[in-house]
């Protein structure tokens, strides 16, 4: 078995274990809410809707488009309109799990049915668009290529129609970014126009980067998603009509795995797998008050180099070790059991190899962070950044005295460890962000477009 095939097999197994843990937590919460777990229970005349009552699985229902390839059709007549059940052809309103208030089911069915047949005629192609995208921290220990977290650290990208191609950048890693069409921002734009069935126009790109470049914080995934979103807007598509699932399929197809692009798009903590047909993600509840303390070395870490040190095969014992830890990790997040995070982030598939051959400071820094009070610490993405997760005495950093600020104590311990190993870098403290990519400015603005659908149902 090739190294690539083996990696995909392990990532699939780990992703399945993590997804299983999420479903188990969801089932427990549903039982608590429903008592006898009866989907047809009523409360004050309303039929219960257990699945979306649970915050772990609450997502933007109208933006979830599941059937591929109809999802990418530019002609509304070609779209199936099916959402939420993959290849089954069902709509969410046909599912036994979706129970609307009994007096309004027909109206909701009509809303869902019409949502995906909105004509896109007279939508203005845009001249310029600005998109904000968050950093991400992937793998999170055992979740190799399938678990990622959105970090409250944002880059801003402006893409405009122009007479000549140009890429300019300022901020983090500006001098290291490719200035040709190999830049992932351009790759994302090309993919968006191709999916829209339109030729790529001449564009200029300006990046205000606050995400450290090639440091294990998802700079490439952020660029891919920003490019896709910008491209769809410039091509004259309204994003709600395409849905965030369309963005996921395009972005993960470029990246090759969903652990970074999913949190860039959706925010929060995301699980992602490929089910054999398409990319699928689920959100995991983020514990309140969770802080992210990251040590970012000054040197660049290449993902290709970090993957190159991994062995082509793994033992059954190591695979079982990671599967168990991934399930434990997801359960700890979903139940706010921060004490279990330390065991949940343990890994045998990539961190030991990378720590031994690339990042000698990795395990000493993890130990220093945890000894200082961190819930856990791990290698962020392919490195070289080390990420620690902490929770203060009250969960609100503004209500704490400095001696209660666990994140400050952990930061000082990580800085001292870096000094001991002679590694220069910087320390940032931030938090998990619940939202993903967003359009912040469009020229001409969306409000100048014509209304293409209206109903009073």
Describe the role of every protein-language-model region.
Residues 2-11, 21-42:
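Short hydrophobic alpha-helical membrane-entry/anchor segments
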Residues 296-357:
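Active-site rim beta-loop-alpha module in soluble metabolic enzymes
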Residues 199-284:
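Gly/Ser-rich oxyanion-binding loop with an adjacent helix/lid
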Residues 54-60, 65-68, 75-78, 86-215, ...:
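ATP-binding N-lobe of GHMP and related small-molecule kinases
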Residues 22-26, 185, 192, 222, ...:
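Stable alpha-helical structural segments in soluble proteins, enriched in small hydrophobic residues
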Residues 2-4, 135-137, 170-179, 209-218, ...:
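A short glycine/serine-rich beta->alpha loop
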Residues 183-193, 326, 365-368, 413-414:
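Short, well-ordered amphipathic alpha-helical segments that serve as non-catalytic structural scaffolds
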Residues 11, 50-52, 60, 65, ...:
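Glycine-rich, charge-dense phosphate/pyrophosphate-binding loop(s)
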């Amino acid at each position: 078995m090739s190294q690539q095939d083996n990696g995909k097999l392990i990532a699939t197994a780990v992703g399945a274990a993590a997804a299983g843990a999420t479903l188990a937590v969801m089932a427990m919460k549903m039982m608590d809410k429903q008592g006898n777990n009866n989907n047809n229970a009523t409360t004050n005349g309303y039929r219960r809707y257990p699945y979306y009552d649970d915050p772990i699985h609450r997502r933007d229902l109208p933006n979830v488009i599941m059937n591929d390839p109809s999802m990418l059709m530019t002609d509304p007549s070609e779209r199936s309109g099916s959402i939420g059940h993959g290849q089954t052809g069902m709509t969410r309103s046909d599912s036994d799990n979706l129970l609307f208030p009994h007096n309004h089911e027909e109206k909701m069915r009509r809303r869902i049915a019409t949502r995906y047949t909105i004509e896109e005629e007279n939508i203005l192609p845009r001249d310029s668009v600005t998109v904000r995208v968050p950093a991400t921290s992937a793998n999170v220990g055992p979740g190799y290529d399938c678990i990622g977290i959105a970090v409250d650290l944002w880059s801003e990208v402006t893409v405009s129609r122009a007479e000549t191609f140009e890429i300019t950048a300022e901020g983090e890693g500006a001098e290291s970014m490719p200035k040709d069409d190999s830049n992932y921002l351009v790759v994302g734009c090309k993919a968006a126009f191709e999916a829209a069935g339109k030729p790529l126009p001449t564009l200029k790109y300006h990046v205000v980067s606050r995400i450290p470049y090639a440091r294990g914080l998802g700079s490439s995934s952020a660029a891919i998603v920003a490019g896709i979103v910008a491209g769809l807007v410039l091509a004259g598509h309204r994003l709600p009509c395409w849905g965030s699932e369309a963005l996921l399929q395009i972005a993960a197809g470029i990246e090759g795995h969903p652990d970074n692009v999913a949190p860039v798009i959706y925010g929060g903590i995301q699980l992602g797998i490929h089910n054999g047909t398409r990319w699928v993600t689920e959100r995991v509840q983020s514990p309140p008050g969770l802080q992210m303390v990251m040590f970012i070395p000054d040197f660049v870490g290449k993902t290709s180099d970090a993957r190159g040190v991994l062995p082509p095969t793994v033992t059954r014992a190591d695979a079982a070790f990671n599967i168990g830890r991934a399930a434990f990790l997801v359960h700890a997040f979903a139940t706010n059991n921060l004490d279990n995070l330390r065991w949940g982030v343990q890994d045998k598939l990539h961190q030991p190899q990378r720590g031994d051959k690339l990042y000698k400071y990795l395990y000493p820094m993890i130990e220093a962070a945890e000894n200082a009070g961190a819930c856990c610490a791990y290698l962020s993405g392919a490195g070289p950044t080390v990420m620690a997760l902490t929770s203060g005495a009250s969960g609100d950093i503004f209500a704490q005295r400095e001696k209660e600020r666990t994140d400050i104590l952990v930061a000082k311990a990580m800085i001292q460890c870096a000094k001991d190993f002679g590694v220069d870098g910087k320390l940032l403290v931030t938090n998990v962000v619940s939202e993903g990519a967003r359009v912040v400015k469009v020229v001409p603005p969306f409000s100048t477009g014509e209304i293409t659908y209206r109903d009073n149902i």
